[in-house]
From Swiss-Prot:
Pathway: Amino-acid biosynthesis; L-arginine biosynthesis; L-arginine from L-ornithine and carbamoyl phosphate: step 3/3
Keywords on record: Amino-acid biosynthesis, Arginine biosynthesis, Cytoplasm, Lyase
InterPro entries: Arg_succ_lyase_C, Argininosuccinate_lyase, Fumarase/histidase_N, Fumarate_lyase_CS, Fumarate_lyase_fam, Fumarate_lyase_N, L-Aspartase-like
Keyword Cytoplasm annotated: yes
GO biological process terms held by the UniProt record: arginine biosynthetic process via ornithine; L-arginine biosynthetic process
Stated name of the protein: Argininosuccinate lyase
Phylogenetic placement of the source organism: Bacteria, Pseudomonadati, Pseudomonadota, Gammaproteobacteria, Pseudomonadales
Listed SUPFAM superfamilies: L-aspartase-like
Enzyme class of the recorded protein, top EC level: lyase
Gene: argH
Entry EC no(s): 4.3.2.1
HAMAP family linked to this entry: Arg_succ_lyase
Natural source organism: Pseudomonas putida (strain W619)
Family of this protein: Belongs to the lyase 1 family. Argininosuccinate lyase subfamily.
Main location per the UniProt record: cytoplasm
Length: 464
C-alpha cells in the first residue's frame, strides 16, 4: 500500500505535497496540452514497440491503445478535464488512461521518461506545423505568380534609398517577393530534416535497461532517423531554435512586403488598392481606410524575432542533459509557428486581391529621371567610357532639375549640348517601355523575362 503524501507520479520520495502556488508555477499543462495528439501518437507507438519486444502482452497493448484513442476523442469533444495538479499533458493523459483501464495504464511509461517523451512530442508537432507553413508559402507564391503574369507589362518606378531609380514592371517586383519566399521554403524544408529525428528511447538521459527497438518506434512515427546519443536526444532544442531562425527570416520578408504595401496604399503613393475586407477604419476620422493586415504582420515580426532570442538565451547556460528550463521552450516556439502561419495565410488571401493603379504607377515612373542610366548606356554604345557618360548624364539631369524637364521631354538640341553623340534615336531609349524592354536577360525586368520567370516559378511549385 502506498504511503505517498502526494498524488504525483513521482511522489514516493516526498514527504509533503507540493505548495499550491509552486504547483501552478511549475505546471505547463495550460500551454502544452496542445501537444495531446502527438503525445498520444507517441504513446501508441511506444506501446506497440513494448509489445513487440515482450515487455507488454498483446492484450495489454490493445487495451492501452484503445484507451488512448478514447482519450483523444474526449479531448477533441471538449470533455477532458485538464488538471493543473498533474503538471503537464503527459501526466494528464496517463492519469486518465489509468482511470479508464486500471493498472495496465501504469505500464505504458515503462522504458520511457517525460524527458524523451516531450522531446518526441515537440518534434512531431513541429514537423506537422512546418508542413502547414510550407503549404501556406506555396499558396502565397501561387498568388504572386498569378499577379506577376497579369502585371508583366505594368510599369512602375523601381527604388533605391526609396528614391526613384529605374523603371521596372510590377510583375518583376512581385517576383522578387516570390524569390524571397522560395528561400524561406528551402530553409524550412532543411529545418524539417533535422526536426525529423527521434529522441524516444533516450529515457531520462542514459537510455533504458529494457530491450527496446528504437528503429521500430522510429518507423511507426515516421521519423527519418533515431537520435544517436541519449544525452543529446533529451536536451537538444537546436531544431526549435533553427525553426525560429527560419521563421524570423520569413517574417522579416513579410515585414518588408508589408512596408511596401503600407507605402503603396497611402495617399502619397496610391500605387495599389487593398479590398475593404483586409482593412479597417478609424473611430474618429470617417475618411480613413487603414491597411491593418500588413501593419500587423510588420508588427508581429518582432514577436518571432523575440522567440528566437528567447530560445537562444534559454539554452545558452544549460549543462547536459534535461533541465526544467526547457519547459520554457514551448510558448515561444508555439507563438512563432502560429504567428508565421497566420501571417502567411493573411498574405496568401490578400495578395491575389490587390488592385494596382496602372496610370498612377506609370506616372510615378516618369518622374525622377528614371531613364538616366539608359541614356548613359546609350552613350557607352556610342564608344564613350562609362564614367564619362555618367558625368554627361549627371549634367543633363541637373539641367532637367533647373528647367523642370525630364530627359525624355528635352529636345534633341537640348540633349546635344551635353554630348554631340546623342542622335534622334535616343528618344526610343528614353521611353519607359524602351527601358524595361532593354533589360531582356534572365532575372531582368523585361516583360518577356517576367513571363519566363513565371513559367519557371510554376514548374517549381508543381515539383513540390
Amino acid at each position: 500500500m502506498s504511503t505517498d503524501k502526494t498524488n504525483q507520479s513521482w511522489g514516493g520520495r516526498f514527504s509533503e505535497p507540493v505548495d499550491a502556488f509552486v504547483a501552478r508555477f511549475t505546471a505547463s499543462v495550460d500551454f502544452d496540452k496542445r501537444l495531446y495528439r502527438h503525445d498520444i501518437m507517441g504513446s501508441i507507438a511506444h506501446a506497440t514497440m513494448l509489445a513487440q519486444v515482450g515487455v507488454l502482452s498483446d492484450a495489454e497493448r490493445d487495451t492501452i491503445i484503445d484507451g488512448l484513442n478514447t482519450i483523444q476523442g474526449e479531448i477533441e469533444a471538449g470533455n477532458f478535464d485538464w488538471r493543473v495538479d498533474l503538471e503537464d499533458v503527459h501526466m494528464n493523459i496517463e492519469a486518465r488512461l489509468t482511470d479508464r483501464i486500471g493498472i495496465t495504464g501504469k505500464k505504458l511509461h515503462t522504458g520511457r521518461s517525460r524527458n524523451d517523451q516531450v522531446a518526441t512530442d515537440i518534434r512531431l508537432w513541429l514537423r506537422d506545423e512546418i508542413d502547414l507553413i510550407l503549404a501556406e508559402i506555396t499558396r502565397l507564391q501561387q498568388g504572386l505568380l498569378e499577379q506577376a503574369e497579369r502585371e508583366a507589362q505594368t510599369i512602375m518606378p523601381g527604388f533605391t534609398h526609396l528614391q526613384t531609380a529605374q523603371p521596372v514592371t510590377f510583375g518583376h517586383h512581385l517576383l522578387a517577393w516570390f524569390e524571397m519566399l522560395s528561400r524561406d521554403y528551402e530553409r524550412l524544408v532543411d529545418c524539417r530534416k533535422r526536426t525529423n529525428r527521434m529522441p524516444l528511447g533516450s529515457a531520462a538521459l542514459a537510455g533504458t535497461t529494457y530491450p527496446i527497438d528504437r528503429e521500430l518506434t522510429c518507423k511507426l512515427l515516421g521519423f527519418e532517423a533515431v537520435a544517436g546519443n541519449s544525452l543529446d536526444g533529451v536536451s537538444d532544442r537546436d531544431f526549435a531554435i533553427e525553426f525560429c531562425a527560419a521563421a524570423s527570416v520569413a517574417m522579416m520578408h513579410l515585414s518588408r512586403f508589408s512596408e511596401e504595401l503600407v507605402l503603396w496604399t497611402s495617399a502619397q503613393f496610391q500605387f495599389v488598392d487593398l479590398p475593404d475586407r483586409f482593412c479597417t477604419g478609424s473611430s474618429i476620422m470617417p475618411q480613413k481606410k487603414n491597411p491593418d493586415v500588413p501593419e500587423l504582420v510588420r508588427g508581429k515580426s518582432g514577436r518571432v524575432f523575440g522567440a528566437l532570442t528567447g530560445l537562444l538565451t534559454l539554452m545558452k547556460g544549460q549543462p547536459l542533459a534535461y533541465n526544467k528550463d526547457n519547459q520554457e521552450d514551448k510558448e515561444p516556439l508555439f507563438d512563432a509557428a502560429d504567428t508565421l502561419r497566420d501571417s502567411l495565410r493573411a498574405f496568401a488571401d490578400m495578395i491575389p486581391a490587390i488592385k494596382p493603379r496602372h496610370a498612377i504607377m506609370r506616372e510615378a515612373a516618369l518622374r525622377g529621371f528614371s531613364t538616366a542610366t539608359d541614356l548613359a548606356d546609350y552613350l557607352v554604345r556610342r564608344g564613350l567610357p562609362f564614367r564619362d557618360c555618367h558625368e554627361i548624364v549627371g549634367h543633363a539631369v541637373k539641367y532637367g532639375v533647373d528647367t523642370g524637364k525630364d530627359l525624355a521631354e528635352m529636345s534633341l538640341d537640348e540633349l546635344r549640348q551635353f554630348s554631340d553623340q546623342i542622335e534622334q534615336d535616343v528618344f526610343a531609349v528614353l521611353t519607359l517601355e524602351g527601358s524595361v524592354n532593354a533589360r531582356d536577360h534572365i532575372g531582368g525586368t523585361a516583360p518577356a523575362q517576367v513571363l519566363a520567370a513565371v513559367v519557371r516559378g510554376k514548374a517549381l511549385l508543381a515539383s513540390r
